[in-house]
Amino acid sequence: MATKILELTDVNVIRAAGGVVYRTDSSGDTELAIIHRPAYDDWTLPKGKVEPDESPEDCALREVREETGLRCVIERPLGCTAYVDRRGRDKVACYWLMEAKGGRFRAGIEVDKLVWLSVEDAIKRLTYPRDKKLLEQQDF
């Protein structure tokens, strides 16, 4: 069986974008924001579908704001992950490192919890291996 390479520009691929959101705590350590989605009972990184005529970067900022309430600034791209979603659709999610600059989390139907964790603890808490791998490949 041939391996299918997913391209972000492929019209049959669902494009998503999100953020690895960080802040520096009072002791100078990096903490990452991860979210809990009750519909899936998972811990993941904030992300969502790229709308038509929306850049992936704008989508990432919008989705992070919608899901976390945080205002962020993009620092750099972190890479993309390709996978098949729960409905059997091909999906490519691209992520950017973002610094939280303000805002406040409010629990909702889509996202009911946000936690700030050390990089090591965030990797342990995340549900999906693809999210864990993305963080493990970074130098925070």
Q: Which residues fall in each region the model found?
A:
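Acidic, metal-coordinating catalytic segment for phosphate/diphosphate chemistry
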Residues: 1-26
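A short, flexible beta-alpha/helix-coil linker loop
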Residues: 40-42
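A short gly/proline-enriched turn/hairpin at secondary-structure junctions
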Residues: 44-47
